[in-house]
Amino acid sequence: MSSMNLRRLLPQRAKQERPQPESSKKKGFLERKKDYVERAKDYNNKRDTLKKLKLQAAFKNPDEFNYKMISSKLVDGVHSEISKTSLKKEQIIDIKTQDILYLQSKRRADDKKIERLQATLQYMDSGLEPTEQIIYVDDEKEVKNFSATKYFDTVPDAFNGSLSTIPKISKLKEGSLVVNPKTAPTLGQLEAMTATSYKELKERKLRRDQLFKAEMDLSKSKIQLKRGTKSGVTKKVGKKEVVFKQVRSK
């Protein structure tokens, strides 16, 4: 076996780069090849970027509109964004007033829907659990002469068992119709309708409360904006938070 082959079989010592001599440290950092490669890549990337930018600037139309023209400005030669909240105090108050009116309209619409749902649920509940009404009379003669249609001001068809409520003749004249037993919903359908309606009622009440809270917060911020001062300042005193409020002296 030759000496060259034997040298390959022996463990080789890891190559180490020459350290920087103490005498040349004052001249600066001793650049290795890996440092040169990184520096060359960075230089080439910057050169290519500048070349592309110069090409774009050469072909750019000076009259071309760009939204940056109205959303930024030059401050000491540096482009800076224009603040979008530079509104006058009166404009902010008007915006908050419009928001409050919008929330009020939505809350009133929810109130009407809640009232309709509650009325519908009362009708369904009365259909699921019919109740009896007891009428007291003085003697047997009144019992014999008692007329339910006259007493309740209704029609005889109102007592056939298919109605959950007894309609008045005045309501019937307005156009209300007696429920047809053939088209009346079954007990299972009524239970399903009731469960769905109760769920919707709960969601609408929650939404109404959230709208009311948002409306109150907007009203409070609007009042504070008009006054120009905060109603209370919260500061930490030790481990507790204390709210300081300005009290008007008599």
From Swiss-Prot:
Give the primary localization class: nucleus
One BP annotation, GO: rRNA processing
Keyword rRNA processing belongs to the record:
yes
Pfam families in UniProt: Utp11
Q: Which UniProt keywords apply?
A: Nucleus, rRNA processing
Point to the regions of Basic and acidic residues compositional bias. 14-31
InterPro entries recorded: SSU_processome_Utp11 (IPR007144)
Q: Which family does it belong to?
A: Belongs to the UTP11 family.
Q: What is this protein called?
A: Probable U3 small nucleolar RNA-associated protein 11
Tell me what organism the protein belongs to. Answer: Dictyostelium discoideum
Question: What lineage does UniProt assign to this protein's organism?
Answer: Eukaryota, Amoebozoa, Evosea, Eumycetozoa, Dictyostelia
Q: Which gene encodes it?
A: utp11
